A protein has these predicted regions:
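Charge/polar-rich, low-complexity and marginally structured segments
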Residues: 151-154
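Short, polar/flexible loop-turn hinges at active-site or ligand-entry regions and domain interfaces
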Residues: 56-59, 101-104, 123-133
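M16 family metallopeptidases and their MPP-like homologs
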Residues: 26-44, 64-119, 156-178, 202
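Histidine-acidic residue clusters that define the catalytic metal-binding segment
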Residues: 3-6, 161-201
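Acidic/histidine-enriched alpha-helical segments
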Residues: 67, 123-147
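Structured segments of extracytoplasmic/periplasmic soluble domains
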Residues: 52-55, 73, 116, 120-124, ...
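Catalytic micro-motifs at enzyme active sites that drive phosphoryl/nucleotidyl and oxygen chemistry
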Residues: 79-83, 148, 192-194
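His/Glu-rich zincin catalytic helix
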Residues: 1-73, 192-202
Length: 202
């Protein structure tokens, strides 16, 4: 029987650290999640914001180079998390990487991967005070495509419609990624404002 350890520590008001350890796994996953009340426009902005943040950062302002750097660290990756929990939305960033015990000569890659994860969150790639326009446009179109794709996913679409009926008039009825119209109207200012708000109060 494998021993699984679990601990949860309060680091500050509204901030907690959860550790789950199971020695049967050879890889690690670090997730940073922001929980905030569900609101259709905010949910849409959050859904796009997280994808823009993981594209690059101030230290590595190139999407290709960031991907290459992580791949060079034993196939590590940085991604996003987006979903709903009742009347709340959970969005954030995550990093997956092999455990340091399994690298060649015990190379410590965990610190390097988590450094880039934190860079993406706290030191985003800004050009003259705004997110890189190229990546902004790219991620906006990807979000629109994802929203459109939900209509073609019969099971997912049916679940979304059921939620709208069951939770009519309640935050839980809202989609975790918003609508095409809302996505099309997201501005740079929306992302910058929401990024600041998440760090300060989510």
């Amino acid at each position: 029987q494998m021993a699984v350890s679990y601990s949860r520590e309060e680091l500050g008001r509204g901030i907690s650290l959860t550790r789950i350890y199971d020695k049967k796994f050879k890889s690690n996953c670090v997730k940073i999640a922001f929980i905030s009340p569900l609101d259709e426009k905010t949910a849409c902005v959050n859904a796009m914001l997280q994808t823009v943040l993981v594209t690059s950062n101030a230290e590595i302002p190139s999407r290709t180079k960031l991907t290459s750097t992580l791949t060079g660290l034993y196939g590590s990756s940085i991604g996003t998390n987006c979903g709903t929990i009742g009347d709340y939305q959970s969005v954030g960033l995550s990093a997956s990487f092999i455990g340091d015990d399994y690298t060649i000569d015990g190379e410590v890659i965990s610190v390097q991967v988590v450094r880039q994860l934190l860079n993406c969150l706290i030191r985003p790639h800004l050009v003259e005070g705004k997110f890189c326009e190229k990546y902004f446009t790219l991620r906006k179109q990807e979000l629109i495509d994802a929203i459109v794709a939900t209509v073609n996913d019969k099971r997912g679409y049916a679940l979304l419609q059921a939620k709208k009926v069951i939770f009519e008039g309640e935050p839980a009825a809202v989609s975790a990624i918003g609508t095409v119209e809302l996505a099309e109207n997201i501005t740079q200012e929306d992302l910058l404002r929401q990024h600041k708000k998440l760090l300060e109060s989510a």
